[in-house]
């Protein structure tokens, strides 16, 4: 069944809200990207207007910036240490924005949205 991002069928009181129209294609949603730690793999998604969005399916390298010096470098991602989005994402090595990942330089916080941007950026913490 399709993922819909339309209005709820329930009112705040719990009463049933009778829709005066059906679902629209513009209200369709998609499954989350759930970027994992592995060899880099991108997914192309067709978006509104025929444009394309790149989703990062898997990644093992990230652009890491040291806030103290302002220098950036590409480093390996060893694993996910903490993810406030979902505790189960740590076990499954899923990277989202705000996740703490382990790198050879130290722990890093992910600042990009890998499922939206198609790139993995982070800052050293």
Swiss-Prot record:
- Spans of biased composition, class Polar residues? 1-11
Task: State any single GO MF term.
Answer: structural constituent of ribosome
Q: Which Pfam families match?
A: Ribosomal_S8e
Ribonucleoprotein listed as a keyword: yes
According to the UniProt entry, which residue ranges have a biased composition of type Basic and acidic residues?
25-38
Q: Which UniProt keywords apply?
A: Ribonucleoprotein, Ribosomal protein
Name any Gene Ontology BP term. translation
Reading the lineage from the top rank, the first entry is Archaea
One GO cellular component term: ribonucleoprotein complex
Region Disordered: list its residue ranges. 1-38
Give the HAMAP family listed for this entry. Ribosomal_eS8
> Which family is this sequence assigned to?
Belongs to the eukaryotic ribosomal protein eS8 family.
Please describe the quaternary structure of this protein.
Part of the 30S ribosomal subunit.
Q: What PANTHER family does UniProt report for this protein, alphabetically?
A: 40S RIBOSOMAL PROTEIN S8 (PTHR10394)
Q: What is this protein called?
A: Small ribosomal subunit protein eS8
Q: What high-level taxonomic lineage is stated for the organism?
A: Archaea, Methanobacteriati, Methanobacteriota, Methanomada group, Methanobacteria
Gene name of the record: rps8e
């Amino acid at each position: 069944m399709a993922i819909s991002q339309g209005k709820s069928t329930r009112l705040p009181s719990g009463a049933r809200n009778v829709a005066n129209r059906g679902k629209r294609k513009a209200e369709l949603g998609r499954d989350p990207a759930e970027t994992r730690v592995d060899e880099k793999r991108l997914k192309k998604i067709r978006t509104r207007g025929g444009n394309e969005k790149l989703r990062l399916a898997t990644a093992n390298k990230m652009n890491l910036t040291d806030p103290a010096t302002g220098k950036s470098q590409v480093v390996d991602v060893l694993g996910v240490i903490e993810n406030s989005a979902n505790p189960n994402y740590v076990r499954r090595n899923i990277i989202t924005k705000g996740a703490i990942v382990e790198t050879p330089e130290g722990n890093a916080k992910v600042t990009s949205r890998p499922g939206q941007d198609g790139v993995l950026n982070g800052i050293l913490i």
